[in-house]
Amino acid sequence: MRSILLTLTALLGGCASYQSLTLPETEALTRDVTQLKVEASAMPGAELAAHRFDPSDGFDMTELAMLAVVNSPDLRLARAEAGVTRAQAFSAGLLPDPQLALGRESVLGSPAGATVAFTAGLTVDIAALLARSATKGAADAEARKSNLDLLWQEWQTVAKARLLFVKLDAITQSQAVLGRQRASLRQRLDEAKRAVERGLVTNDASTPQLTAYEDANRQWNDQERQRNQAQHDLDALVGVAPEVSLPLVGSSDVTVMDATQVRAAIAESTRRRPDLLALQAGLEAQDDRYRGALRAQFPAITFGPTRARDTSNVNSAGFSLGISLPLFNRNRGNIAIEAATREKLRIDYQQRLDATSIESHRLLDEQAILQKQIAEIDASLPALEQVAEQASKAYAAHNVDSLTLTNIEGALLARRLERIAARQALQEQAIALQALLGTSVNLPERSTGASRTHLVEHTS
């Protein structure tokens, strides 16, 4: 008995102990991005992995995407969830603990030759041992699925960062065009007001400039509101405090995939896209659960040695065997559930494949429409710019009125803004297509230990 107590004490000494977890009382947004040390080799895309992260000179499109991957609050939560899945995989691989049963009986009274009786037995759940391979296989597949789901979320976060970069760049270009137009209109409006004050013209002469100026102001303010929204969306995406400045530098140009590249990427999507690979791993996990449910329909067995002594001091040894009788249940309910779940996952996978093909071709067609639109705008702009320049000279020579000049300049302004919007839309479609097809994603090795949690560390 003493040896048993010592064994139990030793086992308890190896147990995990409770540690309290304190909830934060303030926000934890990043206020100094220069303190972020990024592990570029762990980035989800080949372009990101080959890029040097240096926030000291501003953020180009790739650096902004890298910042989003390492510092996004949503991705932090996703990595924590992936940690739970890995812990579950670890738990599934542990062997079941044996069960120890002890009993003691004392004799009432004092009969001659009587002694204290005891029983001791050790049993092991054989069924759990037999089911371990299926359970462990399902857990490992779920861990791979979690890792691939996280990789897909990182890739989509990269796309979101790129989209915001493109949007902010387009807003900057639009405001530059509107700013020049506002300045020109403001100058002519002031000249018209001075002419009215001197009695050279009537108030009607300044109406076209005033109307055009107010319209340009309205468009400027609309762009300013869009900038504010996009900037706060970016702050939330990359997890920085609102007062942190994120100067954007460099080009917003995006490589546009052609039809041949898209078709090739669609054909490779089942081997390249992390979300499809995650669904494959999920189906593999469900297949193992289905196998486990089939095995569980057979009798559950427990077995182990026993040792006993009765009150007459007779010792005995033997074994115990427990078998469940599969007469009514036979695990048929769980078998049906796991089979139906497996079929649902197969249909989900097929639906994802179909949606990929449909959406890819839609984006490809939209790219072609936008490219044609931009080409038409580029073809018409030089002539329109020439007409506007001639009208400006004619207005200065008092050969055309302000209404004619304002209409021509308004048409030129609208065409320039249309080109900026069309270029933005083309870049957004190209980013969406790359995000959908996942052509340059760095895939992890097929391993449950391929964790994606260590992408960044804070340096002091």
Residue map of PLM features:
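Alpha-helical heptad-repeat coiled-coil segments that mediate oligomerization/polymerization in large
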Residues: T202, T356, L363, H398-S402
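A glycine-/polar-enriched beta->alpha junction
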Residues: V70-L77, G83-P98, A120-A138, L148-W155, ...
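Small/polar, glycine/serine/threonine/aspartate-rich low-complexity segments that form flexible
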Residues: E47-G58, A101-A128, T135, S245-A259, ...
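A short glycine-centered flexible hinge/capping loop motif at secondary-structure junctions
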Residues: V196-L200, Y395-N399, L436
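Periplasmic alpha-helical coiled-coil/stalk elements that build and connect Gram-negative outer-membrane
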Residues: R132, A141, L148-E268, L363-E366, ...
